[in-house]
Amino acid sequence: MKKIGITLGDPSGISPEILIKSIDKLKKAIYVIYGSYKIIEKVSSILDKKTEINIIDSPEEAEKEGVYLINVYDRDFCVGKPDKETGKASVLFLERAVKDILSKKLDAIVTLPISKEYVMKAGFRYAGHTDYLADITKTEDYLMMLLCEKMKVALVTTHIPLKDVPENIKPEILESKIRLLNRELQSKFGIKKPKIAVLGLNPHAGDGGNIGREEIDIINPVVQKLKSEGIDLEGSLSADTAFNRYREFDAYLAMYHDQGLIPLKLLCFKKAVNITLGIPFIRTSPDHGTGFDIAGKGIADPSSFIEAVKLALKLSKQY
């Protein structure tokens, strides 16, 4: 039976609530939560919901279908009040789960949201899960991709300031990202010949060089080179109209975060899933953040987390 690790993320956010609301739906596998028993107990009380979780020390102790908890860092966290301690907890939950999956004790991991602000206050030097996972696994070619039933969007750059995006759009980087996306669509999603839309960087894809030259100098030559090798690409496309054609493409490759994720979340919010492509194990996560402002109010929607679990379990069965 497959073992799916779940990291609790920031314990003062909506993650404990989402997890508690989803427990009855966690079926057909062994689920190992990396978190804090006290916060799960506290939020269960707030929600007036009885939560039965088996506490273990290692995934190897979990032998039958059910939900288990490794009590990684147990403190009396305050709901909706993040601080350096909740940031530290987020990091410890993640580090333990990654250690276990690299030791082959898990088949996939699902990561609940962390706060970049508070993990950095706790000494974490990464902009998010994706960069950490790539570094810890020594993965050079990796991609952040969000997907739902209607659309898949991968990103060339992720959590960097907008002003730094152009200098990170380089021919060798773009080429490796396209090749990786094509391979992963084939291997993980069973698409024999993926059709990929490559977006431009500038408005109207540079308008023939009048609004920037990145398309002419970098993006279009890479697209043409890879098309000549048989990869089915179209681009560079103007991002303001490209998403009207989402039914025509198996995936989009966006140049930066908001360019790709605004349309995806508009179309699929609450159902989208984040997956890290290129790393040597399966990692998914929901498409939302920590939700500190609504933590403890009982209104957090677990739908995206449930979809992330479903995808992790589905992909784990292929390996």
UniProtKB/Swiss-Prot annotation:
Class of the enzyme per the UniProt entry, highest EC level: oxidoreductase
SUPFAM superfamilies: Isocitrate/Isopropylmalate dehydrogenase-like (SSF53659)
Residues holding a divalent metal cation: 159, 204, 257
Reactions mediated catalytically: 4-(phosphooxy)-L-threonine + NAD(+) = 3-amino-2-oxopropyl phosphate + CO2 + NADH
InterPro entries for the chain: PdxA (IPR037510), PdxA_fam (IPR005255)
GO cellular component, one term: cytoplasm
Listed pathway(s): Cofactor biosynthesis; pyridoxine 5'-phosphate biosynthesis; pyridoxine 5'-phosphate from D-erythrose 4-phosphate: step 4/5
Record's protein name: 4-hydroxythreonine-4-phosphate dehydrogenase
